[in-house]
Amino acid sequence: IPMWQSALILLLISAFFTMAGGLKAVAYTNVFQMLLLIFVSATLTIAGLYKVGGVSALAEAVPADYWNLFRPNDDPAFPWLPIILGYPIMGVWFWCTDQSMVQPVLAAKNLKEGQMGANFTGWLKILDVPLYILPGIICLALYPGLKNPDEAYMTMVTNLFPVGMVGLVLAVLTAALISTVGSALNALSTVFTMRSEERRVGK
Protein backbone atom coordinates (compact mmCIF):
# COMPACT_ATOMS: atom_id res chain seq x y z
CA ILE A 1 0.00 0.00 0.00
CA PRO A 2 1.44 3.42 -0.91
CA MET A 3 2.40 5.64 2.00
CA TRP A 4 -0.19 8.32 1.24
CA GLN A 5 -3.01 5.75 1.19
CA SER A 6 -1.91 4.31 4.53
CA ALA A 7 -1.74 7.80 6.03
CA LEU A 8 -5.19 8.63 4.67
CA ILE A 9 -6.73 5.44 6.10
CA LEU A 10 -5.21 6.06 9.54
CA LEU A 11 -6.38 9.68 9.42
CA LEU A 12 -9.95 8.61 8.63
CA ILE A 13 -9.92 6.02 11.43
CA SER A 14 -8.58 8.60 13.88
CA ALA A 15 -11.16 11.17 12.80
CA PHE A 16 -14.00 8.65 13.12
CA PHE A 17 -13.32 7.54 16.69
CA THR A 18 -12.44 11.10 17.76
CA MET A 19 -15.73 12.49 16.43
CA ALA A 20 -17.68 9.55 17.82
CA GLY A 21 -16.13 9.41 21.29
CA GLY A 22 -14.53 12.80 21.83
CA LEU A 23 -11.86 13.31 24.46
CA LYS A 24 -12.93 10.19 26.40
CA ALA A 25 -12.19 7.98 23.38
CA VAL A 26 -8.81 9.67 22.97
CA ALA A 27 -8.01 9.11 26.67
CA TYR A 28 -8.93 5.42 26.59
CA THR A 29 -6.89 4.91 23.43
CA ASN A 30 -3.91 6.65 25.00
CA VAL A 31 -4.01 4.39 28.06
CA PHE A 32 -4.39 1.27 25.91
CA GLN A 33 -1.49 2.05 23.62
CA MET A 34 0.67 3.22 26.55
CA LEU A 35 0.40 -0.13 28.33
CA LEU A 36 1.06 -2.12 25.17
CA LEU A 37 3.94 0.10 24.10
CA ILE A 38 5.65 -0.21 27.48
CA PHE A 39 5.25 -4.00 27.40
CA VAL A 40 6.58 -4.33 23.85
CA SER A 41 9.49 -1.94 24.38
CA ALA A 42 10.51 -3.58 27.66
CA THR A 43 10.42 -7.01 26.02
CA LEU A 44 12.49 -5.71 23.10
CA THR A 45 15.08 -4.19 25.44
CA ILE A 46 15.41 -7.42 27.43
CA ALA A 47 15.64 -9.55 24.27
CA GLY A 48 18.24 -7.19 22.81
CA LEU A 49 20.38 -7.21 25.94
CA TYR A 50 20.23 -11.01 26.03
CA LYS A 51 21.25 -11.21 22.37
CA VAL A 52 24.16 -8.79 22.73
CA GLY A 53 25.45 -10.55 25.85
CA GLY A 54 24.42 -8.26 28.67
CA VAL A 55 25.06 -4.70 29.77
CA SER A 56 28.85 -5.11 29.97
CA ALA A 57 29.06 -6.50 26.45
CA LEU A 58 26.86 -3.67 25.19
CA ALA A 59 29.09 -1.05 26.81
CA GLU A 60 32.12 -2.53 25.04
CA ALA A 61 30.38 -2.93 21.67
CA VAL A 62 29.58 0.75 21.06
CA PRO A 63 31.77 3.88 21.14
CA ALA A 64 32.34 5.36 24.59
CA ASP A 65 30.76 8.71 23.67
CA TYR A 66 27.39 6.96 23.31
CA TRP A 67 27.21 6.94 27.10
CA ASN A 68 28.17 10.60 27.47
CA LEU A 69 25.22 12.98 27.54
CA PHE A 70 27.34 16.15 27.60
CA ARG A 71 29.45 16.33 24.48
CA PRO A 72 31.82 19.15 23.44
CA ASN A 73 30.23 22.35 22.24
CA ASP A 74 31.70 21.83 18.76
CA ASP A 75 30.01 18.43 18.41
CA PRO A 76 28.03 18.50 15.13
CA ALA A 77 25.11 16.47 16.49
CA PHE A 78 24.67 17.17 20.22
CA PRO A 79 26.64 20.20 21.47
CA TRP A 80 26.03 20.66 25.19
CA LEU A 81 25.22 24.39 25.20
CA PRO A 82 22.33 24.35 22.68
CA ILE A 83 20.94 21.25 24.40
CA ILE A 84 20.95 22.87 27.84
CA LEU A 85 19.50 26.14 26.54
CA GLY A 86 17.16 24.77 23.91
CA TYR A 87 15.64 21.58 25.28
CA PRO A 88 14.00 23.19 28.34
CA ILE A 89 12.30 25.73 26.07
CA MET A 90 11.07 22.98 23.77
CA GLY A 91 9.94 20.92 26.76
CA VAL A 92 7.95 23.76 28.30
CA TRP A 93 6.41 24.58 24.92
CA PHE A 94 5.28 21.01 24.26
CA TRP A 95 4.28 19.80 27.72
CA CYS A 96 2.87 23.06 29.09
CA THR A 97 1.39 24.95 26.13
CA ASP A 98 0.57 22.44 23.38
CA GLN A 99 -3.20 22.03 23.29
CA SER A 100 -3.09 18.25 22.81
CA MET A 101 -1.03 17.96 26.04
CA VAL A 102 -2.83 20.59 28.13
CA GLN A 103 -6.40 19.63 27.24
CA PRO A 104 -6.46 16.22 29.02
CA VAL A 105 -5.21 17.88 32.21
CA LEU A 106 -7.83 20.62 31.98
CA ALA A 107 -10.48 17.93 31.46
CA ALA A 108 -9.69 16.26 34.80
CA LYS A 109 -12.52 16.03 37.33
CA ASN A 110 -10.71 18.27 39.78
CA LEU A 111 -7.37 19.91 40.48
CA LYS A 112 -5.98 16.94 42.42
CA GLU A 113 -6.65 14.46 39.61
CA GLY A 114 -5.13 16.83 37.09
CA GLN A 115 -2.01 17.15 39.23
CA MET A 116 -1.81 13.37 39.67
CA GLY A 117 -2.06 12.84 35.92
CA ALA A 118 0.67 15.37 35.17
CA ASN A 119 2.88 13.86 37.90
CA PHE A 120 2.32 10.33 36.58
CA THR A 121 3.28 11.45 33.08
CA GLY A 122 6.49 12.96 34.42
CA TRP A 123 7.45 9.68 36.09
CA LEU A 124 6.73 7.81 32.85
CA LYS A 125 9.32 9.93 31.06
CA ILE A 126 12.00 8.20 33.14
CA LEU A 127 11.25 5.06 31.13
CA ASP A 128 12.38 6.74 27.90
CA VAL A 129 16.00 5.73 28.46
CA PRO A 130 15.57 1.95 28.97
CA LEU A 131 12.59 1.57 26.64
CA TYR A 132 13.35 3.82 23.67
CA ILE A 133 16.96 5.04 23.78
CA LEU A 134 18.67 1.83 24.89
CA PRO A 135 17.14 -0.29 22.06
CA GLY A 136 18.72 2.07 19.52
CA ILE A 137 22.15 1.56 21.09
CA ILE A 138 21.55 -2.19 21.22
CA CYS A 139 20.66 -2.13 17.53
CA LEU A 140 23.98 -0.43 16.75
CA ALA A 141 25.80 -3.23 18.58
CA LEU A 142 23.84 -6.03 16.90
CA TYR A 143 23.51 -4.57 13.39
CA PRO A 144 26.39 -2.12 12.85
CA GLY A 145 25.88 -2.21 9.08
CA LEU A 146 22.38 -0.74 9.22
CA LYS A 147 22.40 2.27 6.90
CA ASN A 148 19.12 3.95 7.86
CA PRO A 149 18.80 4.63 11.62
CA ASP A 150 15.05 5.10 11.18
CA GLU A 151 14.83 1.36 10.60
CA ALA A 152 16.54 0.44 13.89
CA TYR A 153 13.42 -0.33 15.91
CA MET A 154 11.73 -2.52 13.31
CA THR A 155 15.03 -4.20 12.45
CA MET A 156 15.30 -5.39 16.03
CA VAL A 157 11.63 -6.36 16.13
CA THR A 158 11.78 -8.48 12.98
CA ASN A 159 15.03 -10.19 14.00
CA LEU A 160 14.41 -10.76 17.72
CA PHE A 161 10.67 -11.38 17.92
CA PRO A 162 8.61 -14.31 16.63
CA VAL A 163 5.99 -13.67 13.96
CA GLY A 164 3.14 -13.26 16.44
CA MET A 165 5.01 -10.62 18.43
CA VAL A 166 5.86 -8.75 15.23
CA GLY A 167 2.14 -8.51 14.52
CA LEU A 168 1.54 -7.23 18.04
CA VAL A 169 4.24 -4.58 17.60
CA LEU A 170 2.66 -3.39 14.35
CA ALA A 171 -0.71 -3.19 16.09
CA VAL A 172 0.83 -1.23 18.99
CA LEU A 173 2.59 1.23 16.70
CA THR A 174 -0.59 1.70 14.68
CA ALA A 175 -2.56 2.34 17.88
CA ALA A 176 0.07 4.85 19.02
CA LEU A 177 -0.12 6.66 15.69
CA ILE A 178 -3.92 6.74 15.75
CA SER A 179 -3.83 7.97 19.34
CA THR A 180 -1.44 10.80 18.44
CA VAL A 181 -3.52 11.88 15.46
CA GLY A 182 -6.71 11.60 17.50
CA SER A 183 -5.28 13.83 20.22
CA ALA A 184 -4.23 16.40 17.64
CA LEU A 185 -7.66 16.36 15.97
CA ASN A 186 -9.43 16.71 19.30
CA ALA A 187 -7.21 19.63 20.27
CA LEU A 188 -7.74 21.25 16.88
CA SER A 189 -11.51 20.95 17.17
CA THR A 190 -11.39 22.55 20.63
CA VAL A 191 -9.31 25.49 19.45
CA PHE A 192 -11.53 25.95 16.40
CA THR A 193 -14.69 25.84 18.51
CA MET A 194 -13.41 28.27 21.14
CA ARG A 195 -11.79 30.72 18.73
CA SER A 196 -14.20 30.66 15.82
CA GLU A 197 -17.54 28.97 16.30
CA GLU A 198 -18.16 30.16 19.87
CA ARG A 199 -17.53 33.76 18.87
CA ARG A 200 -19.70 33.43 15.78
CA VAL A 201 -22.60 31.84 17.67
CA GLY A 202 -22.20 34.31 20.52
CA LYS A 203 -22.55 37.20 18.13
PLM ranges: what are they?
Residues 1-25, 40:
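Transmembrane alpha-helical segments of multi-pass small-molecule transport proteins
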